[in-house]
Amino acid sequence: MLNKGLAEEELFSFLSKKREEDLCHSHILSSMCTVPHPIAVKAHLMFMETNLGDPGLFPGTASLERLLIERLGDLFHHREAGGYATSGGTESNIQALRIAKAQKKVDKPNVVIPETSHFSFKKACDILGIQMKTVPADRSMRTDISEVSDAIDKNTIALVGIAGSTEYGMVDDIGALATIAEEEDLYLHVDAAFGGLVIPFLPNPPAFDFALPGVSSIAVDPHKMGMSTLPAGALLVREPQMLGLLNIDTPYLTVKQEYTLAGTRPGASVAGALAVLDYMGRDGMEAVVAGCMKNTSRLIRGMETLGFPRAVTPDVNVATFITNHPAPKNWVVSQTRRGHMRIICMPHVTADMIEQFLIDIGE
C-alpha cells in the first residue's frame, strides 16, 4: 500500500489509462454481457451504498428485490414463486443444487446434466460433493432426451435443463425433462441465465418455465439480456419455502436467518435490473429481442454467403459457424468446445456492426 495517497488528478489519470486498455463493446461479439441501459445506470447510482445482506437497514431496497422476483415470476408464469437476487448464473446454479441435495438425502448424490451445460455446474458439483452424470447432445445441440432416463439411478437428486445454451443458443426440450422429473420424483433446475430474458419475448416461445409442473427452479441473469448493471442474477423457486432449506442463523444482523450464498449483496444492481424491466415493459423487451434476433439472422445469412455454414440454427441470439477462420483484426469472437466460431448478437451489437464484421471477415 502507498505510504502517501495520490492526488485525485494523478489517481484518475492512472485509472483512465487502465480503462483505455479495456476492449470497446463496439467490437465485442463474444460476450453475453452488454452495455447497461442508461436507466439501469441511473437506478444503480441511487442505491450504491445499499446492502441487501442486512435488509432491516435498507427496507426500501429489500422491497425492490421482492418486486424483481415478482416481475420475473410473473414472466415465468408463476407470480407466487420464491427467489432472491444473486450475483449471476453461477451462484444461482450452486444454490439450486444445494436445494436439490437438501431435499433428497442420499449417500452418493448425482445430478444428470447436459453436455452443453455451463461450466458453473462443475464448480457447483465440486463444492457440494455431487457426481456429474453428463448426457450427450443430439445433432441440434440440445440434450438428447433419449439418454436422460438411462442416466438416472437411485442416487440421482436432480436433472438440469438449459434454456439458451451458452455456446450454441439452444433450448432443451424442457417439457420432456419436466415429465421425466415428475415421473421420477426429481428436482428439475432450468438454467435460463441467458435465455430467460429472451425466450418469453419471442413470437412463438418454447415452454421452459413454471408453466411446466415439473420445473422446480430457474436461473436468470438480468445483467445479460436484461441490460442491467453487473452483477445481477436471480434464482426463482416454485415454492418460497424451498429457500428455507438453505437457511442459516445470522444472530447479529437485522434478520435472524438468511438463505443466500453471499452475505453482503449489492442493492444497486437489483434496482438497476428492476428499473429496466419496468421502464421497458413487455413491448420494449419484445422490440429489443426482435432486434437481436434480426441481427442474428442477418449474420447467419451473410456468413453462409461467404462460405461459413452455421453449426446449428439457434433458438436465441447466439450464432455458431463451422470454420477455423480467424476473427478479423480488432474483432473479438469466441470458439465453442467443438471448435465452432461463436458470436452473440447482444443489444449493443448493431446492424451496422454486423455489416462491418461481414465486410471485414470477407476480405
UniProtKB/Swiss-Prot annotation:
Report the Gene3D superfamilies cross-referenced here.
Aspartate Aminotransferase, domain 1, Type I PLP-dependent aspartate aminotransferase-like (Major domain)
Quick check: keyword Lyase in the entry?
Answer: yes
Q: Which cofactor does it need?
A: pyridoxal 5'-phosphate
Q: What is its EC number?
A: 4.1.1.11, 4.1.1.25
InterPro entries named in the record: GrpII_AminoAcid_Decarb, MfnA, PyrdxlP-dep_de-COase, PyrdxlP-dep_Trfase, PyrdxlP-dep_Trfase_major, PyrdxlP-dep_Trfase_small, Pyridoxal-P_BS
Q: Which organism is it from?
A: Methanosphaerula palustris (strain ATCC BAA-1556 / DSM 19958 / E1-9c)
Q: Which residues carry this modification: N6-(pyridoxal phosphate)lysine?
A: K224
A molecular function (GO) held by this record is:
aspartate 1-decarboxylase activity
Name the UniProt key words of this record, in alphabetical order. Decarboxylase, Lyase, Pyridoxal phosphate
Q: Does the keyword Cytoplasm apply?
A: no
Briefly, what is this protein's role? Catalyzes the decarboxylation of L-tyrosine to produce tyramine for methanofuran biosynthesis. Can also catalyze the decarboxylation of L-aspartate to produce beta-alanine for coenzyme A (CoA) biosynthesis.
Q: Alphabetically, which GO biological process terms does the record hold?
A: carboxylic acid metabolic process; coenzyme A biosynthetic process; methanofuran biosynthetic process
The entry's protein name is Probable L-tyrosine/L-aspartate decarboxylase
- Any one Pfam family match given in the protein's UniProt record, by short name: Pyridoxal_deC
Q: Which residues form a coiled coil?
A: none
- Its gene name is mfnA
Record's family?
A: Belongs to the group II decarboxylase family. MfnA subfamily.
Q: Under which pathway is this protein filed?
A: Cofactor biosynthesis; methanofuran biosynthesis; Cofactor biosynthesis; coenzyme A biosynthesis
